[in-house]
Regions:
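Retroelement reverse transcriptase polymerase core
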Residues: 1-158
Length: 158
């Protein structure tokens, strides 16, 4: 999937003073879902959304969510610890009426694919290791190359 240029936008994860990196203890899951988790992780690897990570100070766990219609697993990440350490982006969101007025009359309103909008914005290279997560059924760590849901200020970056 094509991403926006890093020169245009990157998602960053600055850390507030006084916070130390935290590695969440590994969670256990029902072994019956390991194959479906592995399938989803392979899909994310093939898409280029994640990559192997050899060392990380911040490690989060996955939260597998089963889709009711297909039975497939959607992999969410528990970013609570890194989100606590990240300052809130205080840039105010524009008022909806102003956005609508500015957009009216234009042919192109968005150049992002609505299907995987967050995944079209790169993570800042120096912050990718902060998105590291451990996954049952795999040996090692993975990190997000692109911005994903659940990260603090992702909505503001988008």
């Amino acid at each position: 999937m094509p991403c926006l240029s890093r020169d245009l936008v990157e998602h960053r994860l600055p850390i507030k003073a006084g916070f130390k990196p935290y590695k969440q203890p590994a969670r256990r899951f029902n072994p019956s879902i390991y194959d479906r988790i592995k399938e989803e992780i392979n899909r994310l690897l093939d898409a280029g959304f994640i990559r192997s990570c050899h060392y990380a100070d911040w490690i989060s766990n996955i939260v597998p969510i089963e889709k009711k219609d297909s039975g497939k697993i959607h992999v969410c990440i528990d970013f609570r610890d890194i989100n606590k350490a990240t300052p809130k982006d205080e840039y105010p969101m524009p008022i909806a009426d102003m956005l609508i007025n500015e957009a009216s009359g234009h042919r192109v309103i968005s150049f992002l694919d609505g299907n995987a909008v967050y995944n079209q914005i790169f993570m800042a290279e120096e912050d990718t290791s902060k998105t590291a997560f451990v996954c049952p059924g795999f040996v090692g760590l993975f990190e997000w190359v692109v911005m994903t849901f659940g990260l603090k200020n992702a909505g503001a970056t988008y």
